[in-house]
Amino acid sequence: MKFNLAIAALGLSAAAQAQSVSIITTPVGSFSNSAGAAMAKVLVDKAKLRAVVQAQASTGFEETVSGTADFNVSNSFDATLFATGSGEYEGRGAHKNLRYVGALIPYRVAMHVRADSPFQRIADLKGKRISSEFNTQKTIGRIIAAHLANAGLTYNDVQKVPTPNVVRQADDFMSNKTDTMFFALGSAAIKQANASVGGVRVLEVDTSPEAVKRVQDLLPGAYIMQVSPHPSVEGLSKLTNLVAFDMVMVARAELADDVVYQVAKALYENKAELAATFPPFALFNPKAMAKPLLSVPFHPGALKFFKEAGIAP
């Protein structure tokens, strides 16, 4: 009897362990970290999974494909570059076991300046102090380079201020070491900077076909989105054209289908709960979760749910 009870206990322990999931995000205070926390809460409350958020200084893709972590909250173009071994991942080879779980919300991103700054356009940043390098988060440097390219500039046209990651960049901006700060709208760091420097203001992008193409050359899949002023968004006083790209969730191919199915289902069915924890989820369109991701195939568990929900491509 004791032997049987021991076996049963081991079985229960293994089952409980199988239902634990980890979600890698960018550093605490970043947009994806706040989104990851909201998703973890839904997975705990609605899917009855043991979800833990792991904030990383780097992208966390290596941890995802190796199995150190289960899910990764990223931007669409970075997942594509990692999967194909291109861009910042050149020379590392393709990662063919990266799988797509679904599209979440658009990253609406912008270069922010102080509200009383004389800069009105991105072109006005020529010769100014801008964060660079991003040794532990190369994707941020790429996004800033895309904004500069939109205005016909490169990093060679500005004063480069090295920084390791996006959160340290915000600290430098608040310490007046830089003239502008990149961040996704609605991020905790933007709210902090807004309070710290007496207000921030976003710089609108050029929507001409040539300018948009320069952005997309660096950010595959990016697009222009018009954003209206809203109390939850700092730095906007009028309808403004900004760069956007999708936040996506990815996982490794070997992750159990039933776990991925539960995650996709819980996110699809609980938009209100997600938005209650992280307001930008108000932009989440569950029916667009199956929007294809360039060069990254769907995870079978996610695709199974999307077919059941009638949204599979």
Language-model segments: which ranges?
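Bilobed "Venus flytrap"/periplasmic-binding protein-like clamshell domains
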Residues: 19-45, 50-51, 107-175, 292, ...
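Acidic, polar ligand-binding/catalytic clefts
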Residues: 71-105, 188
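Ligand-binding clefts/hinges and TM-proximal coupling segments of bilobed small-molecule sensing domains
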Residues: 127-146, 222-283, 290-291
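Sec/Tat signal peptide C-region and signal peptidase I cleavage site
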Residues: 14-18
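Sec-dependent signal peptide recognition
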Residues: 1-8
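An extracytoplasmic/periplasmic, membrane-proximal ligand-sensing/linker region
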Residues: 175-177, 185-202, 207, 214-217, ...
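Extracytoplasmic small-molecule ligand-binding "clamshell" domains
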Residues: 31-65, 72, 235-237
